[in-house]
């Protein structure tokens, strides 16, 4: 039997697809590797299953866009997370992400996280960097809830990804939006004020009336 679904998680060679009939765990046909195509979260696919909850992806439908990092397809908005304290904002990375959005028909939204512990100079410099771009800039705090309701409204009806440096609070923000996720949270290196990488794979969750 053939179904159409959306990939919400990929781990190794196994992909979890969400359909109106529930979730199915599928493998991709070998021809995708030969053609240099890798299924990613957000892809809409056709797949065949014998009815045991397992199946085989037979076709990846036309993508609206494709992000490489994070690996995701058919994205509406990219939440670019900067810290208002430490680690200091990497504007070069943020600008690269914005450029990727512009080339991929994705709306960038800039999140200034950790505003509850902000360094005023860092916060105001980040505002000045992007205030004339026309992009939405949202001060948020995963810790005290500042801006979370506005962020939920941004996600509603959209497929969104979070991107930014390690330790800027991406996982903490997602936990604040959907506490049941319980994503692992990294911290800063005491020596170099840089983040420790904690997120190991890309995944979509249905939250706040949308996907992230």
Where are these regions (language model features)?
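N-terminal accessory targeting/assembly segments
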Residues: 1-91
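Conserved nucleotide-binding/hydrolysis micro-motifs of P-loop NTPases
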Residues: 51-53, 84-87, 114-118, 143-146, ...
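Conserved beta-strand/loop subsegment of P-loop NTPase cores
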Residues: 75-82, 103-115, 134-140
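Loop/turn-to-beta-strand initiation segments
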Residues: 77, 107, 158, 208-212
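Histidine-anchored nucleotide/phosphate-binding helix
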Residues: 92-102, 107
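Canonical P-loop GTPase G-domain recognition
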Residues: 117-168
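Walker A/P-loop
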Residues: 166, 171-172, 176
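Switch I (effector-binding) loop of TRAFAC-class P-loop GTPase G-domains
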Residues: 179-212
């Amino acid at each position: 039997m053939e179904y159409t679904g959306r990939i919400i998680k990929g781990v190794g060679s196994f992909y979890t697809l969400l359909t109106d009939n529930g979730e199915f765990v599928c493998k991709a046909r070998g021809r995708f590797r030969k053609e240099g195509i890798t299924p990613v979260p957000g892809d809409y696919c056709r797949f065949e299953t014998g009815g045991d909850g397992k199946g085989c992806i037979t076709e990846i439908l036309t993508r609206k866009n494709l992000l490489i990092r994070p690996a995701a397809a058919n994205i509406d908005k990219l939440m670019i997370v900067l810290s208002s304290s430490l680690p200091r904002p990497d504007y070069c990375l943020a600008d690269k992400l914005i450029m990727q959005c512009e080339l991929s028909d994705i709306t960038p939204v800039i999140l200034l996280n950790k505003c509850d512990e902000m360094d005023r100079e860092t916060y105001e410099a980040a505002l000045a960097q992007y205030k004339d771009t026309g992009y939405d800039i949202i001060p948020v705090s995963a810790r005290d809830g500042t801006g979370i309701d506005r962020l939920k409204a941004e996600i509603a009806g959209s497929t969104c990804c979070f991107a930014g440096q390690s330790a800027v609070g991406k996982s903490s923000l997602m936990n604040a939006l959907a506490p049941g996720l319980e994503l692992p949270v990294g911290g800063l290196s005491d020596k170099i004020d840089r983040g420790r990488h904690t997120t190991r794979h890309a995944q979509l969750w249905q939250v706040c009336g949308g996907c992230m």
